[in-house]
Amino acid sequence: MSNEFITFEKISRKSWKQLHQKSKPLLTQEELTNITSLNDNIDINDVIEVYLPLIHLIQIYKIAQENLSFSKSLFLKKDIQQRPFIIGISGSVAVGKSTTSRLLQLLLARTHKTSTVELVTTDGFLYPNSTLIKNNMLNRKGFPESYNMELLLNFLDTVKGGQTASAPVYSHEIYDIVPDQQQTFTNPDFLIIEGINVFQNQQNNRLYMSDYFDFSIYIDADSHHIEQWYLERFLSLLELAKHDPANYYARYTSLPQNEAIAFAKKVWKTINLENLEKFIEPTRNRAELILHKAADHKIDEIYLKK
């Protein structure tokens, strides 16, 4: 962390957990295990010490947004239009974005019992593999140019306008967009958008995805720790794919482990690390909140925009 974070207040985990005194976790260990991503590490104590204070903070932002919306409607002499409270979550591949997103979805639903809380990932807005292959971009998958940004921004604009919107569905098992399958959203109360690219400058240089966000989170960690998590996850995916020939990773299951690790290290260095250093990490100061993870996946520091 450097002067890049001069606009953030650094908060230790010890101080953060004291900002919210509720000790009831709102979910069971079994529920937490079911939403935890492969090779991630989180327990009930993390929920109580980190995520319950975060839910309380999000509630503060939501009340402020509602008050501003009400005041603007009075000023403009217009009726208030109900719009989703949109939360953007970004960070590297294998850093734990999906676990955080699913956990927030569940906790928000438990604390706002009459509200609808939806989750969408930007993976669904990747171009299909056939398009990437046609344009010789398959090895650039995950980089900014591999996303259909026009479709993604149109989706966000439609959702933010309170209208029904649909998003393509991505499958990590087939490593591609699922044909003829859509995820539909009808004016939810909360919408969580998770992806490596949610803070990136768009190709027209005029509009950011984050322009649509009411709150935003960046999951941070040292790159050598993320690399280790990525390699561990890759080996776990190979184990799962051994008995599923339709799985994308099945093609790598016949490799000796040392060759599989060497392959994963090459992918990390030439694709994921480059993407992280050039396009993902430089955007973290656009987040409202940064959650920093230590080597054991545990959040040890929190940075809140002043």
UniProtKB/Swiss-Prot annotation:
Pathway: Cofactor biosynthesis; coenzyme A biosynthesis; CoA from (R)-pantothenate: step 1/5. GO terms for molecular function: ATP binding; pantothenate kinase activity. GO terms for cellular component: cytoplasm. It is found in: Cytoplasm. Gene3D superfamilies: P-loop containing nucleotide triphosphate hydrolases (3.40.50.300). The keyword Cytoplasm applies. One of its GO terms (biological process) is coenzyme A biosynthetic process. It catalyses: (R)-pantothenate + ATP = (R)-4'-phosphopantothenate + ADP + H(+). It is an enzyme of class 2 (transferase). Its EC number is 2.7.1.33. PANTHER family: URIDINE KINASE (PTHR10285). Belongs to the prokaryotic pantothenate kinase family. This is Pantothenate kinase. It comes from Streptococcus equi subsp. zooepidemicus (strain H70).
